[in-house]
Amino acid sequence: MPAVSRASPLPQGRRVPVLYPGLLTAHHVPPPTLAGIRGEKEQQLNEHTLSMRLERVAAHMPAGARLADIGSDHGYLPVALLRRGAIAAAVAGEVALTPFQAARRTVRENGFEQHISVRHASGLAAIRPQDEITAISICGMGGETIRDILASGKAHLSGRERLILQPNGGEQPLRQWLMENHYHILCEELLRENRFYYEIIVAERIGPVSYTAEQLYFGPFQMQARSPLFLGKWQRMLGEKRKVLSNLALARQAVPEARVEEIARQVRWISELLA
């Protein structure tokens, strides 16, 4: 497959403004009223129309980045970014054969074969040193899966890339890995799409960093900003955790004490957060 091109000019295309601009840091909070958006599988999505989640991921892409989109599916994100002139080149990595073939088709139909290399590979193995990647996006997977991809593919990381991660749950173990590997969380977003809550975590490897257990659980910027959407999410989670705790107490079989203590601790943290 072709390597990512550095020399040939980009095909001319219309620049499209990024939708839903803004990011969640300690100083800027996006509008919380994001409910009612239909999910990716319910839309006719393509390289022209991204889901809200992918639009928000796109908003955090450094200008002129050389992107590795891991688990690229149909390749919509890198193709859309290249059409907008937002990135210089990309690698679209996909381990599953059918999405890999779909991504190749999307790239070919847009005439971007010289600028987007579609590779059938597992995780970060899609990245080669000559790609000189400056940004990595991993979206739509569980946080633990994203963590495992990063951990198993550390040899492919230069440490200079921006990580733009959109986990479907499991944010705590992902943040734990980022902290242990000296990645600072630069900003976070929370959005609601198709009735579900999703987070976006943007991180860069800067040096040692320390987060409290609560910050790893809730997100350091999320805790500080306390947006209505964030508080609504954890109000709902509190009810679910309390129900789990009650069910564990009524369980016929013995439940590991560590499991009960973990849920009880989470209930306490959420209660204190909402107090």
Report the location of each language-model feature.
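S-adenosyl-L-methionine
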Residues: Q44-G64, V79, R104-Q130
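Conserved SAM-binding loop of SAM-dependent methyltransferases across substrates and taxa
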Residues: H74-I87
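Conserved SAM-binding motif I beta-strand of class I
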Residues: A89-E94
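Short alpha-helix immediately C-terminal to the canonical SAM-binding loop
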Residues: L97-Q101
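Short SAM/SAH-binding signature in class I
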Residues: E132-G140
